[in-house]
Every structure is written in C-alpha cells, then in structure tokens.
C-alpha cells in the first residue's frame, strides 16, 4: 500500500470556536498540500456555504487539491467542486450519481454492515470511523479501534475502493492508522498546539510527513 495521504476537513464551527477565520485557516492548510479538503459547514446558510466553496476552490486548485462539499451535491455542483461527501442520513450514493454524474462521491460508514453496503454502491471512496473517540463530533458513533480499521481495510481493498480513516487521529496515532488506510481525515489535528495561524502550514506538513512509514 502506498503511503497514506491527508484528507483535511475544514470545519467552520471548529474554526470559529478557536477564533480563526475559515479562509485564512484553509489557506495555510492548502499551502501544506494535502490530497483533499472538505468544507464542513453544518450550520451555515446555503448561500454562505456556496460562497465559501467558491473561495476554497481558488485556494485549492493552484495546489491541485481536490475539494469536497459536505452533504450537499447541489452546492458542490454550483461551486464547481470536485465532489461531495455524504453521510448515512444524506442522499444515497445512487441518487447523487444520477443527479450529478460528474461529481466524485464519498460516503461515511461506522461499522462493518454499513461499510459492506456502501462498497456495493461503488463510491469513489468510503470513510470509516471513528477510529478513536473524538470530541469534534458531538453525536459520534462508537469507536472501532485499530482492529475494526484492519477489517475495514480488508473489505475496501477487496472491492478496490479507497478507504479514508477518520476520528480521533492525532500526530501520535497517525502512522499506525496510515498503515491500514489510503487517506487520513482530520479536523482538530490540523491546528498546532500553539493555536497560531502562522504555525498551521508547518504543522500540517509535519503531519503529512508522519504518514509515511518509511
């Protein structure tokens, strides 16, 4: 398996809770060149989310970073994003494919049953988690641990669909998780211990380097 790559989730609520401007934070994250970024704006209006997506495209494209919208294929299309990420209670992958055939589609799963069902739908990637307990998401499912991740990796590899690991992954855990996933998705781990915007790029670059087991 090739070294895992970083899937950076730009969460509006997280940024606001830390006193960070979303676009300033995203600019520093993009400068570190993760493989993907996703905009997570659960409580924004559709118009605000669309505006943010368009701004993020301008930040991501120069670095050849894929941009995903969370939950909303309609906004992803309007903004010109690369794809959309849907959860268990969002539009099913099949409907997203019909309405937006050119969008890449990723889907969240939380256990073996959900993962198996998702793999049958042939999304562009499946996310599994939380791997560890997390405080970023208030209604998080039970953590599956490394054993659960190993099983998920076997199923995803057999289906030849990339696997994204998410949930409670920090610098100390990243390399162990990276041994079993194609991409590592994080929110709070993007922010350095200093909490300072000027330290974000170097911090994220270090995180990405830490994913390589060599």
Regions found by a protein language model. Give the residues of each.
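Conserved N-terminal beta1-alpha1 strand-loop-helix module at the mouth
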Residues: 1-85, 90, 98-124, 151-163, ...
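Generic structural marker for isolated residues within well-ordered, non-membrane alpha-helices
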Residues: 93
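Histidine/lysine/aspartate-rich catalytic loop segments that bind and position anionic ligands
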Residues: 113-142
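CoA-thioester-processing core
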Residues: 135-136, 140-156
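Terminal recognition/anchoring or ligand-binding modules at protein termini
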Residues: 183
């Amino acid at each position: 398996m090739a070294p895992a790559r970083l899937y950076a989730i730009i969460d509006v609520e997280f940024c606001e809770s830390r006193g960070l401007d979303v676009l300033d934070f995203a600019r520093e994250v993009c400068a570190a060149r993760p493989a993907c970024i996703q905009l997570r704006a659960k409580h924004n209006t559709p118009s605000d989310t669309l505006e943010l997506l368009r701004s993020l495209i301008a930040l991501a494209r120069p670095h050849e970073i894929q941009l995903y919208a969370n939950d909303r294929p309609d906004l992803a299309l309007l903004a010109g994003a690369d794809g959309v990420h849907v959860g268990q209670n969002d539009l099913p992958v099949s409907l997203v494919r019909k309405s937006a055939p050119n969008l890449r589609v990723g889907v969240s799963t939380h256990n073996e049953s959900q993962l198996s069902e998702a793999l049958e739908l042939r999304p562009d990637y499946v996310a599994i988690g939380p791997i560890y307990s997390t405080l970023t998401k208030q209604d998080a499912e039970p953590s599956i641990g490394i054993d659960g991740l190993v099983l998920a990796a076997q199923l995803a590899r057999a289906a030849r669909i990339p696997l994204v690991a998410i949930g409670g992954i920090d610098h100390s855990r990243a390399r162990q998780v990276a041994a079993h996933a194609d991409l590592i998705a994080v929110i709070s781990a993007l922010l350095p211990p200093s909490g300072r915007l000027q330290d974000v790029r170097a911090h994220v670059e270090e995180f990405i380097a830490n994913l390589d087991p060599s």
